[in-house]
């Protein structure tokens, strides 16, 4: 499914909230992990010499490498290769560049983290990556204030699993082949996280409900044939984004899996507005696949 997993971190406890998913998902997917920390130093600081700026950059690089090695130490039992990348530059640009080295790379990122000289405004970084990357993307939304760092102390897989908040995966579909591209990704995550799947199809008209229910029943059978838990699907009506957000409110602790359609690059999406709204306003973690 994936040849590599990229995990951007900024050193904050909020950014580290993605780590339980990295541990548990990597146990199932068995793909190499690359931990990334990006730091930036202003090119021109009034009254500060170039030598001083270079020294600061070297200190930040050493700090990034040290932190990433500490995180790597928590991943010794995942059964796959773990590498680290500490790099100077714009956080979103570096993450996208690293991800696009391989099209089958998935980016797993927390949507918030502290801002500051060496830390990112993670909400902004995650949004930029979401808009620009062609790679699959898992966005974990922070749900709590910062506490103790997740890289402190010893934890086994059971301990990491206990930290997961996702208890269900909502698979959003509109019946198109593009929207269905998210299905194998959702199935892979359901297997790794050991959670049920809830497929939903957004309909323009109640007159189509019979066809939509048949579509969902076939998908439910497909999931069950793969030994995945699925209690049934649901047909939604109305504005697609609003309907999906309402489902996340009725089924809390859900991961929303969806395909976005639109241009890659820094430009805004053309057809990805539904995904955009759901990611921004649902408060739920999201697995986003760019349709091709």
Enumerate the predicted regions with their spans.
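Glycine-rich, Arg-bearing micro-motifs that act as flexible, cationic patches
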Residues: 106, 110-132, 146-147, 259-281, ...
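Structural beta-alpha unit
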Residues: 1, 73-107, 146, 225-256, ...
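A short acidic, glycine-rich active-site loop
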Residues: 53-66
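Hydrophobic, ordered structural segments
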Residues: 71, 78, 86-88, 97-110, ...
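Intrinsically disordered or low-complexity boundary/linker segments at protein termini
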Residues: 1-17, 80, 106, 127-181, ...
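Short, structured motif recognition centered on aromatic/hydrophobic residues
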Residues: 7, 25, 33-35, 67-68, ...
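Small/aliphatic-rich secondary-structure junction motif
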Residues: 1-51, 161-211, 217, 221-234, ...
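C-terminal functional regions that serve as terminal interaction/effector modules
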Residues: 24-25, 215-216, 224-227, 237, ...
């Amino acid at each position: 499914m994936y040849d590599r997993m990229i995990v951007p971190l900024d050193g904050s406890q909020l950014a580290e909230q993605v780590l339980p998913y990295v541990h548990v998902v990597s146990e199932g997917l068995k793909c190499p992990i690359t931990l990334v920390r990006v730091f930036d130093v202003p090119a021109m600081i009034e009254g500060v010499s170039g030598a001083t700026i270079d020294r600061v950059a070297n200190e930040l690089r050493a700090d990034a490498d040290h932190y990433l090695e500490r995180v790597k130490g928590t991943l010794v039992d995942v059964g796959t290769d773990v590498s680290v990348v500490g790099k100077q530059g714009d956080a979103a640009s570096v993450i996208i560049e690293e991800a696009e080295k391989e099209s089958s790379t998935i980016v797993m990122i927390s949507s918030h983290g502290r801002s500051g000289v060496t830390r990112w405004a993670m909400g902004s970084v995650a949004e930029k990556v979401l808009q620009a990357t062609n790679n699959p993307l898992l966005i974990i939304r922070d749900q709590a204030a910062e506490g103790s760092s997740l890289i402190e102390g010893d934890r086994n897989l059971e301990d990491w699993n206990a930290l997961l908040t996702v208890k269900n995966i909502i698979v959003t579909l509109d019946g198109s082949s593009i929207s269905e591209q998210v299905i194998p990704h959702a199935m892979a995550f359901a297997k790794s996280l050991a959670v049920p799947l809830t497929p939903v199809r957004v309909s323009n008209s109640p007159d189509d409900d019979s066809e939509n229910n048949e579509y969902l029943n076939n998908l439910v059978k497909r999931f069950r044939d793969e030994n995945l838990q699925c209690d049934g699907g649901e047909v939604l009506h109305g504005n697609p984004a609003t309907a999906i957000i309402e489902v996340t409110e009725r089924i809390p602790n859900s991961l929303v899996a969806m395909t976005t359609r639109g241009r890659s690059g820094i430009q805004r999406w053309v057809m990805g507005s539904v995904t955009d709204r759901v990611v921004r306003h649902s408060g739920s973690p999201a697995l986003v696949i760019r349709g091709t």
